């Protein structure tokens, strides 16, 4: 267990930065959308682009990793995510932001796939649950810290967008400097939804409802709070 954690510290640190930026970005865009007077329909449409990108990325990422490897994929899509948030601050329109959210979704699912396949390869059946639980604590803890960074500067300014980009870029440093070899890519045949349901009906159904609730909370909670005249600190 300790050996796995020692060999994966760069990945944990990199994902901590990624999720800090992700948590910051989600709250920032929600608050800014209200300040720009986007309609609720436009805001919901814009924020849903992330999950459309998630589906697209999930279908394409195995082929990309098989061609260029884990580290290059992580670096490329973290760089793309860093670039995208800066474009948000320049082109302020619901449809443009929707397209940018699609690209963000693609980037994030690629990053998640690299991280979780890496950890899965490094761990065994005996310690995989413990390793992944630490990974999840880091993810959600970092996301919470990122949301608090909304107090750094007013969402109307450029500075919060720049800070998200800086944090995302910082995630590249430990990953690119690690001496540990990435896992060998093992391409697995995709499962259909019916096959997945037969394999784990409870897991599939519970994941669907969990994702529905989580996506609403993480994407629209800041919108609701701002509409109810909560302060940024609150």
Give the ranges of each region predicted by the language model:
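C-terminal membrane-cytosol helix-exit motif in multi-pass small-molecule transporters
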Residues: 150-151, 165-185
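Cytoplasmic helix-loop-helix junction between adjacent transmembrane helices
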Residues: 102-137
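Residue-level signature of mid-helix packing/kink "hotspots" within the transmembrane helices
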Residues: 51-59, 143-144
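Structural signature of the two symmetry-related core transmembrane helices
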Residues: 72-86, 165
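Helix-to-loop junctions at the C-terminal end of transmembrane segments
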Residues: 57-70, 154
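Helix-loop boundary and gating motifs at the non-cytosolic
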Residues: 3-51, 200-203, 207, 215-224, ...
